[in-house]
UniProtKB/Swiss-Prot annotation:
Keyword Nucleotide-binding: yes
This protein's GO CC annotations: cytosol
Protein name: Nucleotide-binding protein P9215_05621
InterPro entries assigned: DUF520, UPF0234-like_C, UPF0234_N, YajQ-like_sf
HAMAP family per record: YajQ (MF_00632)
Entry keyword annotation includes Nucleotide-binding: yes
Length: 165
């Protein structure tokens, strides 16, 4: 019997790179002349980044810094889901950035259907927030990886193919 090959499709990011990115952002905020004295805070919890500052202009500057530093550290900008800007006490503004991780069930079904429609001799299974793509042909799997990278653009979520076996 022929050997079967597989890979996993995941939507995640390197958390340590995100922590490093936010450390660089905080350092730049403390050093930039236009941001000194703004009492800007950038905090990270399990699923969100919280930015609190004194004006919307400063908030936009901080968001630009976050994007620049994330790109330099090879983090996809698609992991950031920017929330509404809220007014908080003392004429300050707050924004919550949700960190997207994992593939939702409906998106997983779209990816699975698209791959199976394009490649007939392939098996796609949904395991929680990942997809396992298996086939007897390495060429089919390489074509599936190409399809996944094309789907990433249209679905607006970061997708990676890993565990290629």
């Amino acid at each position: 019997m022929a050997e079967s090959f597989s890979f996993d499709v995941v939507s995640d990011f390197d958390r340590q790179e995100l922590v490093n990115t936010l450390d660089q952002v905080k350092r730049e905020i403390s050093q930039r002349y236009d941001l000194k004295g703004t009492e800007t805070s950038v905090d990270l919890d399990k699923e969100n980044i919280f930015i609190i500052t004194n004006s919307e202009l400063t908030l936009n500057s901080v968001n630009d810094i976050i994007r620049q530093k994330a790109i330099k550290r090879n983090l996809s900008l698609k992991i950031f889901d920017y929330g509404e800007i809220e007014m908080v006490s003392g004429n300050r503004v707050k924004q919550t950035i949700l960190l997207k991780q994992g593939i939702k069930q409906d998106i997983a079904k779209k990816i699975s259907k698209n791959i199976r429609d394009q490649i007939k001799k392939i098996n796609v299974s949904i395991n929680g927030d990942t997809l396992r793509v298996a086939s007897k042909s390495k060429n089919d799997l390489q074509f599936a990886i190409k399809l996944v990278s094309e789907l990433e653009e249209s679905l607006n979520i970061p997708l990676k193919a890993n565990n290629f076996r």
